[in-house]
Amino acid sequence: MKLDVIKLDGGKGGSIELPDDIFGIEEIRADILQRCVTWQLAKRRAGTHKIQVRNEVSRTGKKMYKQKGTGGARHGSRRAAQFVGGAKAHGPVVRSHAFDLPKKVRALALRHALSSKAKDGSLIVLDSATLTEAKTAALRASFEKIGVTNALVIAGAQVDNNLKLAARNIPNVDVLPNAGLNVYDVLRRRTLVLTKDAVAAIQARFQPEEAA
């Protein structure tokens, strides 16, 4: 598929040919996208939730009263879950929430995420993403010219420092290098903005997979 390339000032920068196997998938697999997003969010959870179990609660372990002859139910330690101040039964413990997702499924999800943006007309290719000075107002004005209000910008192998500084105070705009491209961030923003260098990097990223 062919897409026009624009400049940050709104001018034309030619055109670019995008590979259909990455940007031109017609039937978007929502189930694959959901699996990948769930995998990403689970992997980044801290998993530091913790509650005291029976051997950690600061209460006596002495038997409450004798086993027989009271007419009451049989009880032992006051740390048991049924008592006020006792332990929590089967409470959360420190653990990792991460789970495995095959590399091929992750790659397929990224293809479908990129294709979904192209299909919706929410994909913009920039000639380059560099600024002469780190001015937020100037960058916001440039974004307004090209219709960007809520976007993920993949700015190249290295993010231009002026661009990074200017963009960090603009709400709903994320700027990442090529290596930071991921399914969750693509889907959470309305528009995907790629530089020509980023497009080339995406193509190179999928080449080893195709060769295999």
From Swiss-Prot:
Q: Which UniProt keywords apply?
A: Ribonucleoprotein, Ribosomal protein, RNA-binding, rRNA-binding
Ranges that cross the membrane: none
Q: Which superkingdom?
A: Bacteria
What GO cellular-component annotations does this UniProt entry give?
Answer: ribonucleoprotein complex; ribosome
GO BP term, pick one: translation
Q: Which InterPro entries does this entry report, sorted A to Z?
A: Ribosomal_uL4, Ribosomal_uL4-like, Ribosomal_uL4_dom_sf
GO MF annotations in UniProt: rRNA binding; structural constituent of ribosome
| Pfam families in alphabetical order | Ribosomal_L4
Q: Does the keyword Repeat apply?
A: no
Q: Which HAMAP family match?
A: Ribosomal_uL4_B
Q: How does it assemble?
A: Part of the 50S ribosomal subunit.
This molecule's function is given as: One of the primary rRNA binding proteins, this protein initially binds near the 5'-end of the 23S rRNA. It is important during the early stages of 50S assembly. It makes multiple contacts with different domains of the 23S rRNA in the assembled 50S subunit and ribosome.
What family does this belong to?
Belongs to the universal ribosomal protein uL4 family.
What is this protein's name? Answer: Large ribosomal subunit protein uL4
Lineage at the top is: Bacteria, Pseudomonadati, Pseudomonadota, Alphaproteobacteria, Caulobacterales
Q: Which gene does this sequence derive from?
A: rplD
